[in-house]
């Protein structure tokens, strides 16, 4: 279209010397008043990237000690704290997060049990279940059956499932996991199964006509809250161990 218009203008100009300029004026007027299409402009707005959180906010330098390049802030509670570089390997980072989560959950249960147990019975947590007349302050049979057989079996299956996800869900290994819908992993994320059995109050989802539907926003918020409480509980257990070495209990150390 542009080439045709330009050719018409040039032809008109070449004949203007014979027509006294009238044809030229008409062509020029028509060309100027023609609709001109301007190219569209596209403005690309770059999304603002949230800055990584730091465990030392006031320090802006320090290399991998302060801001490790292998921690991008995507994990819940990730503030870039890895001074020993344990998470450089992505496989190890995934395993350490799994270990932190499991140990944190055990610590939260232990802290609650220590306070409730002592408040209820008055017996220090490090003497609970002890038999004063026995050679050892515990039963070897109970310890063997609980730690090695029961917990060992469960932990071995969790270990295998970590490296081969859902490999332990087959019928012969755990008959209930395929037949009972409540035991399924509703979120698809390791360590956060959800569902009516693992989330009976639907804190990280909703129940629609008895069907559990996970809520991503709720789940991410609870992930952060859980890892924060887990770290506090593990730190509290470390303090409890030091107190127990001095023969004191948490309530006793507080003068209660």
UniProtKB/Swiss-Prot annotation:
Gene3D superfamilies: Chlorophyll a/b binding protein domain
One of the GO BP terms on file: photosynthesis, light harvesting in photosystem I
Annotated keywords: Chlorophyll, Chloroplast, Chromophore, Membrane, Photosynthesis, Photosystem II, Plastid, Thylakoid, Transit peptide, Transmembrane, Transmembrane helix
InterPro entries, per database record: Chloro_AB-bd_pln, Chloroa_b-bind
Domain of life of the native organism: Eukaryota
Membrane topology value: Multi-pass membrane protein
Annotated SUPFAM superfamilies: Chlorophyll a-b binding protein
This protein's record includes keyword Chloroplast: yes
GO MF: chlorophyll binding
Gene Ontology CC entries for this record: chloroplast thylakoid membrane; photosystem II
Location of the protein in the cell: Plastid, Chloroplast thylakoid membrane
Residues annotated as transit peptide in the record: 1-45
Transmembrane segments: 106-126, 134-154
Family, similarity comment: Belongs to the ELIP/psbS family.
Name assigned to this protein: Chlorophyll a-b binding protein CP24 10B, chloroplastic
């Amino acid at each position: 279209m542009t080439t045709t218009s330009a050719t018409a203008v040039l032809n008109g100009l070449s004949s203007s010397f014979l027509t006294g300029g009238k044809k030229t004026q008409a062509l020029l007027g028509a060309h100027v008043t023609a609709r001109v299409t301007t190219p569209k402009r596209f403005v690309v707005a770059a999304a603002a990237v949230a800055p990584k959180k730091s465990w030392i906010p006031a320090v802006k330098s320090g290399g991998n000690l302060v801001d490790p390049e292998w921690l991008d802030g995507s994990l819940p509670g990730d503030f870039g704290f890895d001074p020993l570089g344990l998470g450089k390997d992505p496989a190890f980072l995934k395993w350490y997060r799994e270990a932190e989560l499991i140990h944190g959950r055990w610590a939260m249960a232990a802290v609650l049990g220590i306070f409730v147990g002592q408040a209820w019975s008055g017996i220090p947590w490090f003497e609970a279940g002890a038999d004063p007349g026995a050679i050892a302050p515990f039963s070897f049979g109970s310890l063997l059956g609980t730690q090695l057989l029961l917990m060992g079996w469960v932990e071995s299956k969790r270990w295998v499932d970590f490296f081969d996800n859902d490999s332990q869900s087959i019928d012969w290994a755990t008959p209930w996991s395929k037949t009972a819908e409540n035991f399924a992993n509703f979120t698809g994320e390791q360590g956060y199964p959800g569902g009516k059995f693992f989330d009976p109050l639907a804190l990280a989802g909703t129940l629609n006509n008895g069907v559990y539907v996970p809520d991503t926003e709720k789940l991410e918020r609870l992930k952060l809250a859980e890892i924060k409480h887990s770290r506090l509980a593990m730190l509290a257990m470390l303090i409890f161990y030091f107190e127990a070495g001095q023969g004191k209990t948490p309530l006793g150390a507080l003068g209660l």
